Regions:
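Bacterial N-terminal signal peptides that target proteins for export
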Residues: 1-10
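Residues at the start of alpha-helices and the adjacent loop-to-helix junctions
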Residues: 5, 17-19, 41, 434
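C-terminal segment of classical bacterial N-terminal signal peptides
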Residues: 16-26
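Surface-exposed extracytoplasmic segments
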Residues: 26-454
């Protein structure tokens, strides 16, 4: 039995497409499973998916992060996308959100070149100018191709090729990422307009055929939480200052704006991502998978974590019991706020997005709340005729506090009815503000000026 009106609204918001027939006739610790933890360029960190609007066009914004815990100041700074890894963002349309079937795949493939190999210098030969990508002093240069694969028809369409990745933010040699265009200053905070973006990011946003937009490059790690206290089973969160486990680290990220006109009129979609490598025979082998935050880390036991990473959402019935009877419920002595709630979120493991709402509120905008529905952040849904969650688990936005949202859903934040002040791990925001325009993810942190865990 639901405990309050708030819980009823939460359940309706989370389960909307099932309770109200929406479909027509992971934060992560970044070390999700044993094997993939040994393969940084293919190790997925987080997936984001939410409805947005830009230039009068309605989009499904999707993003995939890889390469966890990039230390901004390490030298030589050689973090990059791997030429031998295939990065896929997968979309399930309509009824496929229930079965987990992939209908469309957006594939990202990279190629690395060096302008000068007769030098000990790797990424940079000096200060990288901010007027064009691959300026003379940018030695490490990555190109990429974006391909749309329609699994329903078999059609393959190249949306863009020879697209360019901006340099990493090393500091003095990449001054235009940083406040005042000074490499000795911290990274630029989030922009509210395209004009306000740093020079390198602006140059790396590419329009593609059919109104797609894409960005690929280094970003700040936008996941925030005291992961150590959770997975050490300490749960004290008693430090006088919040401990953001991902604070001060960067990642690499691909961000794709998908026009809703490309999604076959679906009122709901499900999004997940995979990374794959080719074996000796040339066959593509999946090595990692990411959907909702926390599923692998907090619900799937050790014996099945690697199995999850090489499987598809269509096989997620095998993991249903882990969502129905989570081990953490026994550890904490609690029950989810509603029977079946976690199963609806995680089985199949897709980030489900209601596309009949207005665009999602972005972090920093009026009405945005890090707790999504539990903080009163809801959106009207044409499909349900009511309200649905403004953020995760209806999509996932940059700034959604997925730890606190999950703790509430698990029943570990008390009986309510008001969850709006929930602050389990005392980490309530990212270490740098997000952009309110594409690519939304925050500026990568300066290699010379950054702090960890604050």
């Amino acid at each position: 039995m639901l405990r309050s009106n708030t819980a009823r609204l939460a359940l309706a918001a989370v389960l909307g497409w099932q309770l109200f027939a929406i479909i027509p006739a992971q934060a992560s610790s970044h070390m999700d499973a044993p094997l993939i933890s040994l393969d940084d360029p293919a190790n997925t960190t987080d997936v984001y998916a939410f409805k947005s609007k830009s230039g009068g066009i309605d989009y499904l914004t999707t993003a995939l992060g890889v390469y966890p815990f990039e230390e901004p100041g390490v030298g030589p700074n050689n973090y990059r996308f791997d030429d031998t890894v295939i990065y896929d963002i997968n979309v399930a349309l309509g009824n496929s959100t229930t079965s987990g079937r992939t209908d469309i795949t957006y594939r990202f493939e990279f190629q690395t070149r060096f302008a000068n190999e007769n030098t000990v210098l790797q990424s940079y030969l000096g200060v990288v100018g901010g007027r064009r990508l691959f300026a003379p002093k940018q030695n490490l240069r990555q190109f990429y191709k974006v391909t749309k694969i329609d699994r329903r028809t078999g059609n393959v369409t190249v949306l863009g090729d020879q697209l360019k990745v901006p340099p990493n933010n090393q500091g003095r040699v990449t001054p235009f990422y940083n406040q005042g265009n000074d490499g000795d200053n911290p990274a630029q905070e989030g922009a509210r307009t395209v004009a306000g973006l740093d020079a390198y990011t602006k140059l790396a946003i590419f329009p593609l055929n059919r109104n797609y937009q894409v960005f690929a490059g280094q970003r700040d790690d936008g996941f925030f939480a005291d992961i150590q206290s959770i997975f050490d089973l300490d749960f004290s969160f008693s430090k006088p200052q919040p401990f953001d486990s991902q604070g001060g680290f960067n990642i690499h990220m691909v961000v794709l704006n998908i026009p809703l006109t490309e999604l076959a009129g679906s009122s709901a979609v499900g999004v997940y991502a995979t990374t794959s490598r080719r074996d000796a025979s040339g066959a593509v082998k999946q090595v990692a998978r990411q959907g909702n935050p926390l599923f692998v880390e907090a619900l799937i036991p050790l014996k099945d974590k690697d199995r999850y990473n090489i499987s598809r959402p269509t096989a997620d019935e095998a993991f249903r019991d882990y969502a129905a009877n989570p081990e953490l419920s026994a550890v904490l002595g609690v029950q989810p706020i509603s029977p079946g709630l976690l199963e609806t979120i995680f089985i199949p493991d897709l980030i489900k997005v209601d596309l009949t709402t207005p665009p999602a509120r972005l972090s920093g905008e009026a009405g945005f709340n890090r707790l999504s529905v539990f903080g009163g952040d809801v959106l009207p849904s044409t499909a349900t005729g009511g309200n649905v969650a403004g953020g995760w688990p209806n999509g996932r936005r940059f700034g959604d506090d997925v730890i606190d949202i999950a703790v509430i859903a698990l029943g570990a934040a008390g009986n309510g009815p008001d969850f709006s002040n929930t602050n389990v791990d005392k980490v309530t925001e990212n270490d740098i503000t997000y952009n309110q325009v594409f690519p939304y993810a925050a500026t990568p942190l300066n290699g010379r000026v950054h702090q960890h865990h604050n």
